[in-house]
Structures are given as structure tokens and as C-alpha cells.
Amino acid sequence: MIPTEPTWRSYIAETTQPIFSPQQCQMVIDKGMSLKKETASVGMGNPKGSGVDPEKRVTTISWIPFKEMPEMYRDIETTMLKANGNHFGFDDMRLTEPAQFTHYLTGGFYDWHMDNDVMGKHQPPVRKISMTLLLSDPSTFEGGELEFMSKGK
């Protein structure tokens, strides 16, 4: 069963403390931009997988291999474990998926959606925590707000 509002609201934790310095953010951006990009897809709600839907998502993505940025993954895991300990208390927490680096060009977007096991490697899906990190300085672009679904959406 998928939690519905308002139950799922208790599952949201937010930090305003930076995980990365501006220099570390730039290193992640540089790595993400250097990797092979693919047109981002969406789950499409079918068991056979995902597809491209330009009405839901227009962006490119790449996957940052664990071995190529171990310090980044260490910092992400530290933050994830702290959030889990402070808010959720899940057992057996570990990073199981590489970080998805998403690049939005002007006019790019990702409409309302629910995160899941985007790599499709875990059956049944085991993602317990989903994280979003803003790497770009928000004064350098318009839009891009991360919004959570509210009643009626």
C-alpha cells in the first residue's frame, strides 16, 4: 500500500545544513556533466519498465559510479544515516543505487511523481529513503522548487 496524505507527511525530513561545500558541489557537477547522458524517463506505471514522456519530464540524467566519487558517497551516507536515526529508525540502511545526476536545460522540468527503485534492480523494491540535493546556486536560475504533494494534488 502506498501511504497517502497526511500519513506520508510524517516521513519527510529536511535539512538546511549544507552537505557539500560550494567547491564539492562544483566537483559533483563537473563529474555529472562529464558522464554519458541519457534522456530521462518516467515509471509510466507499468511493470515492464519506464519510458520517455515529455509531458511529465524533460531533462537529461547520468549515473555517478560509486567508485568515481567515494567521498561524495561517504558524505551522503553520513547524512542519510543521521536522518534515519533522528527521524525514521529503519533497519539495514545502506546506499544501494548510484546517484542520479540530473541536468535541466532552460524549459526542462519533472512534473509530479513518486520516487521508487529507479534502477529496477531490487525486487521487491527496497528504497527506504530518497534524497534530493541541490548543487547549483539558487541565485543562478529560476524555478526548480522541490515541492511535496499536498491534499488534492
Q: What are these language model-derived features?
A:
Residues 1-153:
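Fe(II)/2-oxoglutarate oxygenase catalytic core
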